[in-house]
Amino acid sequence: MTLTITTANLNGIRAAKRKGVSKWLARNTPDIWCMQETRAPQEILDEMFQDFGATYVEQGRIATPDDLATVDDVCRIKGRAGVGLLTHRPVERTRIGL
């Protein structure tokens, strides 16, 4: 079995979307996608992750966008840092922090 893990420094998830990350995702749909520098508040991440979930549905990886497991940590300072993780694989538990 092959497991595809992708990591990407997005330098802002909204900027990445404008630059075509959705097209990249449609071609690749990794099993696990780790994102750094998401630079967005929670409500934006939730919306983007739903959009990305729709791509996983289109690619036959999951049945509904809600089946995409997501974990994220938003920076308390607006427009800074932030990380996110998407996977269509089951997540047993998560921990935020070191």
Role assignments for model-derived ranges:
Residues 9, 13-16, 50:
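Non-transmembrane, interaction-prone segments in cytosolic or luminal domains
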Residues 14-27:
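Short, acidic/polar
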Residues 17, 43-45:
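Short glycine-/acidic-enriched loop or helix-start segments at secondary-structure transitions
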Residues 1-6:
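Extreme N-terminal starter segment of soluble prokaryotic enzymes
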Residues 8-9, 25-43:
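Active-site beta-strand/loop signature of hydrolases that rely on acidic residues for catalysis
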Residues 39, 46-98:
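Structured beta-strand-rich core segments of catalytic domains in phosphoester-bond hydrolases
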